[in-house]
A protein has these predicted regions:
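Short helix-capping/linker turns of helical repeat alpha-solenoids
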Residues: 22-26, 40-44, 48, 59, ...
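Helix-turn-helix repeat elements of alpha-solenoid scaffolds
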Residues: 6-9, 59-72, 103-107, 139-141, ...
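Hydrophobic face of amphipathic alpha-helices that form TPR/SEL1-like repeat modules
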Residues: 35-36, 54-57, 89-98, 123-132, ...
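Terminal, low-structured helical/coil segments at or just beyond the last alpha-helical repeat
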Residues: 241-277
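TPR/TPR-like (Sel1-like) alpha-helical repeat modules
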Residues: 182-189, 222-245
């Protein structure tokens, strides 16, 4: 990329000064622009890619408006292609991977994560792409090695529960339900330690509930499963507040599982009450 095409502080100012976005729904975005747009000099006061990163963290309960997205995309691409900022490639991947940025494109996300896969957060998301076949062909072998690397180097809760899925289902590895169970509990410990996202916690609790449903149906296992599903529902609903609308199907599935567990519990209680002949 030729240097003259990079976004300069004055060009960045003009783009953001004219940006159309929902001010009332995006108070954090408005505050960031107030802090870093110098109306007297008509330029921004920090590097564009740093401003882009701050805007990515703002107003998570609102789908990103196109003008803000386009600025972030341009600023991060400049950062990556001009100085090979590896973190810019990771953020670009996130920009196209997560729903709240309003421009999901798994192929672009996979390509950006692949450029700098040695960066921890990129590695787990690259593994997730290979696991689900997002933006690339599904490949459990590649997924496994990305997830193992992320689990060992970053202690990622996300990588741990996906590794649990691989052992639970026998994807690339031998099926091992106890190992899957241990990985899910380890993922939960890590998620609590680092205060992971609501979505990550929900995914873990959903899996713990399901793995306990595979056990003999006792009051203890069923009560644990129900508690896990209740927490999964709570965290999925929290995640939906951050514009992860595709999770509504997850919430429906969890509520069906809650109903199933309650029916098992009712049957057990009725059996206990039946007189012995």
């Amino acid at each position: 990329m030729e240097k003259e095409w990079l976004m300069t502080p004055d060009v960045a100012y003009e783009r953001l000064d004219r940006a159309i976005y929902n001010h009332s729904a995006c108070p954090e975005t408005a505050h960031i622009l107030y802090l870093y747009l110098d109306d007297e000099k008509r330029e921004i006061t920090i590097p564009p890619k740093e401003l882009a990163k701050e805007l990515m963290e703002a107003d998570k309960n609102h789908l990103m408006d196109n003008d803000i997205f386009n600025f972030i995309d341009k600023a991060l691409r400049d950062g990556y292609y001009s100085i090979k900022d590896s973190w810019a490639s990771y953020y670009l991947g996130c920009l196209y991977y997560f729903e709240r940025f309003n421009n999901v494109n798994y192929e672009k996300a996979f390509n950006y994560f692949s450029k700098e896969k040695h960066i921890g957060p990129s590695t787990v998301l690259l593994g997730e792409c290979c696991f689900y076949g997002r933006g690339t062909e599904q490949n459990y072998e590649k997924a496994f090695f990305c997830l193992i690397q992320s689990a060992l180097t970053d202690n990622s809760a996300r990588s741990l529960y996906l590794l649990g899925d691989m052992y639970l289902n026998g994807y690339y590895v031998d099926k091992d339900i106890p190992e899957a169970n241990d990985l899910y509990f380890h993922a939960l410990e890590v998620a609590d330690e680092v205060d992971s996202s609501s979505e990550t916690k929900a995914e873990i609790y959903e899996r713990l509930g399901k793995v306990y449903l595979l056990r003999p149906k006792t009051l203890e296992t069923l009560h644990f499963a129900l508690k896990a599903f209740n927490l999964a529902e709570k965290y999925y609903l929290e995640a939906m507040q951050e514009c992860m609308f595709s999770l509504k199907d997850k919430v429906k599935e969890i509520r069906d599982l809650q109903m199933e567990v309650r029916e098992y519990l009712d049957d057990l209680i009725l059996m206990d009450k039946e007189p012995v002949s």
